[in-house]
UniProtKB/Swiss-Prot annotation:
GO terms for molecular function: protoheme IX farnesyltransferase activity. Interacts with CtaA. Pfam families: UbiA. It comes from the Bacteria. This is Protoheme IX farnesyltransferase. PANTHER family: PROTOHEME IX FARNESYLTRANSFERASE, MITOCHONDRIAL. Belongs to the UbiA prenyltransferase family. Protoheme IX farnesyltransferase subfamily. Converts heme B (protoheme IX) to heme O by substitution of the vinyl group on carbon 2 of heme B porphyrin ring with a hydroxyethyl farnesyl side group. It is found in: Cell membrane. Pathway: Porphyrin-containing compound metabolism; heme O biosynthesis; heme O from protoheme: step 1/1. The chain crosses the membrane at residues 32-52, 65-85, 108-128, 131-151, 158-178, 186-206, 251-271, 287-307.
Length: 307
């Protein structure tokens, strides 16, 4: 980018900064939406660990508090650090150009320091549960910040797979807070569901935002290999979810039916993409379905334990 272009970009960025409150800026800095959605999976892991170990939530309210707050701080911390790392490419993408590290609402130094502080504070809270919960939190943070944000995101199309490891860790944090052995197979089914789910979820988003990723120089699969290969990959990973509910028979037949219907619905919608001419519209439908899928699936896991 030459000097004149840089000045023009800076001037445009300044004049288009949206009016936001300090609280809104803080929520954007820590990516509160991501923190909230992952908190559901943390709680599900915690709840199911209680259920399968015959423990009462009322006897473990302190651990529940430390787990939710600790994991939330860890996730907020790594999201802060991601904003710090991506501050040079975020202005190039429509969905990220209003982040506070781009608009100047928060300076890079603050984002870095604040991210590290709340990350460490999160580890302290998790340590009040079990060391294994801290280890799971560290694995998730290291994978997201180092292996994904710093290494693979800008170099390899496998960045989505690598990033999915960190996103699959939250339910293990919740489980480890109660049962540090992580010996129950359902704990690892939660990990696998989250790991596999994220890949078609984010590939659908990458199709929707393909021009933005291309402009930012991020080698997402649809940018490098096009929509047809991306759709095939989405289908492969979606089909991989199909057998997982049958390894979770401990949650009962009702859950297995709900999960299987959700999987079949996603697969059918996926196959529809090979007949649909509007790939972008289809990718939006797949993305929205994935969000509803995850919410219904994890809420169902909790609800069925009451019956």
């Amino acid at each position: 980018m030459n000097h004149a272009t840089s000045e023009l970009h800076d001037e445009s960025a300044v004049t288009s900064i949206p009016e936001t409150t300090r609280l809104q800026d803080l929520k954007a800095l820590v990516k509160m939406g991501i923190v909230n959605s992952n908190t559901l999976t943390v709680f599900t892991g915690f709840w199911l660990a209680l259920h399968f170990n015959g423990l009462s939530v009322m006897d473990n309210l302190d651990k529940l508090f430390f787990t939710i707050v600790g994991s939330g701080l860890v996730m907020a911390g790594v999201c802060c650090l991601n904003n710090y790392i991506d501050r040079d490419i975020d202005p190039l993408m429509e969905r990220t150009k209003t982040r506070p590290t781009v608009t100047g609402k928060y300076k890079p130094g603050f984002a870095l320091t604040f991210g590290l502080v709340i990350l460490l504070l999160g580890f302290v809270f998790l340590l009040l549960t079990t060391p294994m919960a801290v280890l799971m939190g560290f694995i998730g943070a290291f994978t997201y910040v180092v292996l994904y944000s710093l290494w693979t995101k800008r170099k390899y199309t496998l960045n989505t797979v690598v990033g999915s490891i960190s996103g699959a860790v939250p339910p293990l944090i919740g489980w480890a807070a109660i049962d540090p052995s992580l010996g129950h197979p359902i704990a690892w089914m939660l990990f696998l569901i989250m790991f596999i789910w994220q890949i078609p979820h984010f590939l659908a988003l990458a199709m929707k935002r393909v021009d933005e990723y291309r402009n930012a120089g991020i080698p997402m699969l649809p940018v490098v290999h096009g929509f047809e290969i991306t759709k095939r990959q989405i289908m492969i990973w979606t089909v991989c979810l199909l057998p997982l509910p049958f390894y979770m028979s401990g949650l009962g037949i009702t859950f297995m039916v709900i999960a299987t219907l959700l999987n079949i619905g996603w697969i059918v919608l996926g196959f529809y993409g090979f007949r649909k001419k509007d790939d972008i519209k289809w990718s939006v439908q797949m993305f929205v379905y994935s969000l509803n899928y995850l919410t219904i699936l994890f809420v169902s896991m909790i609800v069925v334990t009451f019956f």
